[in-house]
């Protein structure tokens, strides 16, 4: 929440500064909201956030969904869990990315899996809420004159909702968001590391439900993040990660 408050303040300051500067503002038609594409940085490689801050935020989310301990206990099939002590599940299936188990545990069902469903939904709700908040700030500060788009909705390649990308309906109904963006699909693009045997050209597919996005009156912005002929490394873009701090 502190990060969200600070980023909101800084975004408002940036938009106000640009809007008040005639030389700058005449070149700006909109804002592309981006925060590591809105999923936790390296969440697949390093796993989810089990910090006290995230545990507390998850507990507050649970209290909205489940008014009483009894409601939570019934949903989770656990007579001992309480709203005051519930935490992020420490045995989240698929928490650490493993390509050999890519299609395992995509769907959850039953009371024993409800705690996982809830955490996945929490992450998606939190991500969508952050984007929605920043979009509102841009629209308010520009009096609805600026276009607002955001990276989001990578359902076709980020299969796990731990990415936070599986709440597109929320943002499709948000009047402050004009569109979404995403890179060309990584799994079938000119021999990427995910699909090294794919032919030159390949499909270059969309990562999201582009037709649904457009039917809801939103823009889809297709990003090409492929290496150009200027590249002098032997590593494809998707293998070139920054070292985590």
Q: What kind of feature is each model-predicted range?
A:
Residues 135, 168-169, 207-211, 245:
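Short amphipathic alpha-helical segments and helix-helix/interface helices
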Residues 1-171, 177, 185-186, 203:
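Polysaccharide-binding and catalytic clefts of secreted carbohydrate-active enzymes
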């Amino acid at each position: 929440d502190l990060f969200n408050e600070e980023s909101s303040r800084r975004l408002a300051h940036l938009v106000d500064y640009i809007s008040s500067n005639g030389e700058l503002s005449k070149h700006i038609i909109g804002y592309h909201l981006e925060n590591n594409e809105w999923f936790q940085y390296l969440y697949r490689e390093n796993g989810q956030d089990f910090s006290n801050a995230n545990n507390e935020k998850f507990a507050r989310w649970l209290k909205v969904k489940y008014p009483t301990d009894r409601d939570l206990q019934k949903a989770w099939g656990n007579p001992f869990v309480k709203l005051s002590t519930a935490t992020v599940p420490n045995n989240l299936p698929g928490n650490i990315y493993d390509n050999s188990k890519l299609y395992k545990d995509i769907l959850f069902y039953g009371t024993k899996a409800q705690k996982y469903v809830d955490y996945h939904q929490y992450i998606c709700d939190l991500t969508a809420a952050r984007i929605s908040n920043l979009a509102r700030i841009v629209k308010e500060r520009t009096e609805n004159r600026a276009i607002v788009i955001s990276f989001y909705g990578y359902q076709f390649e980020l299969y796990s909702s731990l990415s936070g990308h599986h709440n597109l309906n929320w943002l499709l109904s948000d009047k402050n968001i004009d569109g979404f963006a995403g890179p060309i699909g990584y799994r079938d693009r000119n021999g990427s590391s995910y699909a090294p045997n794919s032919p030159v050209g390949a499909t270059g597919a969309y990562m999201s439900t582009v037709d649904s996005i457009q039917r809801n009156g939103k823009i889809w912005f297709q990003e090409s993040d492929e290496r150009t002929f200027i590249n002098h490394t032997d590593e494809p873009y998707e293998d070139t990660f920054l070292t985590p701090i």
